[in-house]
């Protein structure tokens, strides 16, 4: 980061990103956003008004902030902002992390100057963009300085007992909580467990589970500080298959079990990574209905560290620096 670099994050008013961005002390501005649906809904008649409003709001924020470059990673909020950037002749970059491009990124492609991607097969799906660059995962700086010892202190963990981390992200936490619930007591036989339940998730699980009284079970709604340390401490991570968390796990070479959010691009991510022997993939339904049987098979065949190393081979280090270099390359050439 250059000393003079300034940032503005444009997002939805009530989205999960707002809290994280504000805690990182990055200026945040909310803009209206419609949902780009592929299916029939009465809201399809209303959403164009929100999209238009998002375009006007995006235009006003860009006029005021005067950025040298705009970066989008595929949210619905991004589309009107990308077109506002095109209107103002501000370079726009798409960060395509997932294997399968979403509708938002496809709609932004005609007005984008560059594409940054993780998987080779993704590049061919954006024929209108001439400048393309494959990089490794873009991750938080704290991943590189993470220490397991700090996680022991912060979260009250036993320094010697192995750890399983369960995390479902924002929208995907509730379904994962329900699926993993029957398996918890069996995991606690050999492991301590940190379970990121999501907001309100602990209230759902507590009346049902005797695990809450177990000394090695640590339910936490969200982690605002120390997530890198927690990942460093973990021996196995059960997670959704979003590329944000997967990139961090790849850098740390962690053995990972993927439970993708059903019916989403995460299933494509998980399937590709499993086919390359870089993580295990189990559906949410199978985990809920046959979790113990599945776990026994997994545990019998597991070779500690093998899949974590393979994940790192697929998603190699250096992406954060490469992405920053591209941004400055584009801004310096304006």
What are these regions (language model features)?
Residues 303-317:
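A short, well-ordered alpha-helix in the C-terminal region of glycosyltransferases
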Residues 297, 316-334:
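C-terminal alpha-helical cap of glycosyltransferases
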Residues 72-73, 227-268:
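A donor-sugar binding/catalytic signature common to diverse glycosyltransferases
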Residues 16, 27, 86-149:
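Active-site-proximal region of nucleotide-activated glycan assembly enzymes
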Residues 3-50, 135-136, 283-286:
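Conserved nucleotide-sugar phosphate-binding/catalytic loop shared by glycosyltransferases and other
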Residues 15-19, 58, 67-88:
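An aromatic- and histidine-rich active-site surface loop
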Residues 20-24, 148-153, 157-236, 246, ...:
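Donor-nucleotide binding loops and adjacent catalytic segments primarily
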Residues 40-69:
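An amphipathic, basic-hydrophobic alpha-helix
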